[in-house]
Amino acid sequence: MGTKLKKSNNDITIFSENEYNEIVEMLRDYSNGDNLEFEVSFKNINYPNFMRITEHYINITPENKIESNNYLDISLIFPDKNVYRVSLFNQEQIGEFITKFSKASSNDISRYIVSLDPSDDIEIVYKNRGSGKLIGIDNWAITIKSTEEIPLVAGKSKISKPKITGSERIMYRYKTRYSFTINKNSRIDITDVKSSPIIWKLMTVPSNYELELELINKIDINTLESELLNVFMIIQDTKIPISKAESDTVVEEYRNLLNVRQTNNLDSRNVISVNSNHIINFIPNRYAVTDKADGERYFLFSLNSGIYLLSINLTVKKLNIPVLEKRYQNMLIDGEYIKTTGHDLFMVFDVIFAEGTDYRYDNTYSLPKRIIIINNIIDKCFGNLIPFNDYTDKHNNLELDSIKTYYKSELSNYWKNFKNRLNKSTDLFITRKLYLVPYGIDSSEIFMYADMIWKLYVYNELTPYQLDGIIYTPINSPYLIRGGIDAYDTIPMEYKWKPPSQNSIDFYIRFKKDVSGADAVYYDNSVERAEGKPYKICLLYVGLNKQGQEIPIQFKVNGVEQTANIYTKDGEATDINGNAINDNTVVEFVFDTLKIDMDDSYKWIPIRTRYDKTESVQKYHKRYGNNLQIANRIWKTITNPITEDIISSLGDPTTFNKEITLLSDFRDTKYNKQALTYYQKNTSNAAGMRAFNNWIKSNMITTYCRDGSKVLDIGCGRGGDLIKFINAGVEFYVGIDIDNNGLYVINDSANNRYKNLKKTIQNIPPMYFINADARGLFTLEAQEKILPGMPDFNKSLINKYLVGNKYDTINCQFTIHYYLSDELSWNNFCKNINNQLKDNGYLLITSFDGNLIHNKLKGKQKLSSSYTDNRGNKNIFFEINKIYSDTDKVGLGMAIDLYNSLISNPGTYIREYLVFPEFLEKSLKEKCGLELVESDLFYNIFNTYKNYFKKTYNEYGMTDVSSKKHSEIREFYLSLEGNANNDIEIDIARASFKLAMLNRYYVFRKTSTINITEPSRIVNELNNRIDLGKFIMPYFRTNNMFIDLDNVDTDINRVYRNIRNKYRTTRPHVYLIKHNINENRLEDIYLSNNKLDFSKIKNGSDPKVLLIYKSPDKQFYPLYYQNYQSMPFDLDQIYLPDKKKYLLDSDRIINDLNILINLTEKIKNIPQLS
């Protein structure tokens, strides 16, 4: 009868004929009864199901139809199985009850329970089991029951309280329940339950998870079955739910096909994290490459009963796809199940069994042959083979540049066609993964493909799904490779590469307990981290196979058992997305290698719960996170990662050998690579140099981020510059960084800095922090490809503050070198600048000067400086290793590896790219419409302000903060001259000086026209703030002086005669200013002592001022000023329309000069010149 009533869901039937009749009768009784409860309980709900089902109903149920409660059920179970249940809803009352009765007798507890009366916080129900019915449907793992429930209502109850005889049993159940009223007929209850007959054990027992569908209205059996099928669709995550019998049959068919009788997991190919040994010894010319999507691995299994997906744990999903023809039945193919917005995909990357052939160990079927078989399956079975032409289909020559250009175009066309086909699909879209197989013409070829795939798919957004990494598959091996974990470094395996930020270890976790058995809570007393903030200590376990059984053991690094200190929110330990993480589950962690000065327990950061592995632990007591040996291997990739930049360098034939040499020389040593993020260590070393760098940044920010500015800070890191923007009076600030940990997770994150600043500073501007990568476009779609798994609040910030928003100033301090790695990254960065910067807005940049480093490294491999510590050991302060070749064209992709002892652990190198001033100025003008306003070397600023900083701060009336910074910089200057407390300080100062003087700053403005006579605003602002006599700066545009670039000469006399001839009729009052540079050699860097000399030329009745400036490169320039003391100020009088130049500025120039002369105290002794 049941089968005849089904009219949907592929005629799926839940009830047998007998069950059907019994349930009809139960529904009739429910409709006629007053106090009957009718509910369906779903068995075998594990933690992954619990989380997925909860999330599903939260997303589809209106907020006013959702209830959540935490309460304690105390049930008195009588010999006749009837139940008297008291529910306590007040958490304080629950705590008091547990404390009071933890050691009491059962009789005392029973008498207390019966003494309670119903109230707002107490609910009492009597369950009459004798009046109910129960049907178990094992084939669908559900129980259908009806029970009489009589609530006790104060003063209205029809039943009396039970008498305590001592024969009662007590059961305690602490519940966290979510209730969803999904329609007018039914309610879904999802409950996390801790059950125990012993009260004091209640909070220590593991959770069970319950799912119930309860009727709230009268319905017929067809409606009930339809409701149940809808729930099964959610539980099984499929449109076609299947019974336990069908699932068991599919698993049995799979085991028989592959002759793997005892397994509870897929017999799939192992994929291991790639390391330098694999790159050096195995991958070149022997591997193909494809992308790894952010999806789940499944086998697709074709049978005569349908097509199914088998998960790692042999969970079965049935697909809504017609049965294939007989030749393609008993077929197994390996792939990724990928969910995207609006479409689901299954991407096949290998074949296991097809048309009677087992491909697992057959060496005659290499990868290229299996690819042909996969293509045929996709075409014949699913009709989704999208054409992709091999290079040799259209070309005869094998040249890397031609191949690269061809595949870039072919991939773009392929994915365009792919998306068109996908958008037309209404069901699961099944197609192939695309492999690029090298021709073997150069060892760099495979890495060229890997670099191309990653950048085009991620930063150019070619794919409709997010990437999780790159897969390297051996060309000449069968599907399965024989060899255990011990052989992973001795034979070719399949390798997985992930960006270093996503290298993670899966741990089985247990929280430390207190004396009561509950999770222990500790409080952080560190002011630097989070004073007084509560946290839990999480013990981190991995799996170890011992005598054929897997057991969890605590993960160790250098013999130290690893733990994670996880801060709590509302009493719950949470992952980075704010989701609670629970005891006895498997959680994915990343390790923040940038927290250099913190204990390891603060560096482990939980990313997400791994529900698949948690399920495996709960079902089979297997997969306690990663296996120990696998975890150790991943740890090596965390501490010595293969970065995107290394892959890119390996993909360039001109730098391949050099990169291989670096990987070989430093393999398993302290030469580590770190990408895209670095932060200053908490150290007193080179405090003067750091203060000097910050002083320059402060003045840039204060000058160009004026009151009311809206600022976008690209590469804001952990917010070290926030106070600078606050002091500048900005109105609104948005900081962007690729490192989400530095923005939000760690204790000294940008967000935490902002919160702390708000406590001490009034009227602080709104500041927001967005996890984003400027190498991709600032759109949500683009950023989700680069940073998969970002939380919803970050998506909201991108849409709100990046998409369609423009800023007065964009700040980019010491990060632009990351965006010059390749053309695609640079183009995206420039598009972002163009899209986000207002007209007439400013772009502020600091970076190494590429010309300086390029010149110093000509014919050399490295540039470094060192110092001797207090133990007499010589330490490298910084080292730059040249990755590029001297023959490379200056511009993009000029790679160096930088070790900086201030930001990195010993041996940790950061890949950067040289920033060449000429390239930067030309490219930003062409791509963004930016004009250079001003730029100079830190070296020149350093020399210019030497006299100022060598004076004590007391002479300037500074604030305490300013005086501290001034003092640090002053000591830096003095140390360089040998005037310090000890030789170590002198040594460190000189070593740090060599690093700092490699830097340059730039200010660009977004405007189509710019006046070359515009002054150096940074210098003017500096001078105003320090109230110091104005120095003549080594700039072309400085202190509102106009420099006549047309009359530059190396002969001062010719310049002077030119001025005299030009202004013969004005009888000028002339001063000749000579900028003398006395050079002191310090290793290969020169210290310059500036000296200003003045010569009085001639007096006049209506004096004019003419100046000659000698630049550091020994060029002489005429400078023009005119004093309008005898006439009112009029802009028209100082502007030369015919030359479109300002001849002079107002009284301020003369005032500046007078101050300068007075400060020198030389005016009285200046000789007259005829």
Swiss-Prot record:
Location in or out of the cell: Virion
Pfam family, one: mRNA_G-N7_MeTrfase
Major location category of this protein: virion
The entry's keywords: GTP-binding, Hydrolase, Methyltransferase, mRNA capping, mRNA processing, Multifunctional enzyme, Nucleotide-binding, Nucleotidyltransferase, RNA-binding, S-adenosyl-L-methionine, Transferase, Virion
CDD domains registered for this protein in UniProt: AdoMet_MTases, CYTH-like_mRNA_RTPase
Any GO molecular function: RNA binding
Residues that bind S-adenosyl-L-methionine: K697, G715, D737, Q813, F814, T815
Catalytic residues as annotated in Swiss-Prot or TrEMBL: K292 (n6-gmp-lysine intermediate)
The protein's annotated pathway: mRNA processing; mRNA capping
Documented EC number(s): 3.6.1.74, 2.7.7.50, 2.1.1.56
Residue intervals of the mRNA cap 0 methyltransferase domain: 684-1007
Reaction equation(s) it catalyzes: a 5'-end triphospho-ribonucleoside in mRNA + H2O = a 5'-end diphospho-ribonucleoside in mRNA + phosphate + H(+); a 5'-end diphospho-ribonucleoside in mRNA + GTP + H(+) = a 5'-end (5'-triphosphoguanosine)-ribonucleoside in mRNA + diphosphate; a 5'-end (5'-triphosphoguanosine)-ribonucleoside in mRNA + S-adenosyl-L-methionine = a 5'-end (N(7)-methyl 5'-triphosphoguanosine)-ribonucleoside in mRNA + S-adenosyl-L-homocysteine
Gene Ontology cellular-component annotations: virion component
Marked site positions, mRNA cap binding: K724, R753, H817, E912
Residues that bind mRNA: N693, N694
Family: In the N-terminal section; belongs to the dsDNA virus mRNA guanylyltransferase family. In the C-terminal section; belongs to the class I-like SAM-binding methyltransferase superfamily. mRNA cap 0 methyltransferase family.
UniProt function note: Responsible for methylating the 5'-cap structure of mRNAs.
Protein name listed in UniProt: Probable mRNA-capping enzyme
Organism: Acanthamoeba polyphaga mimivirus (APMV)
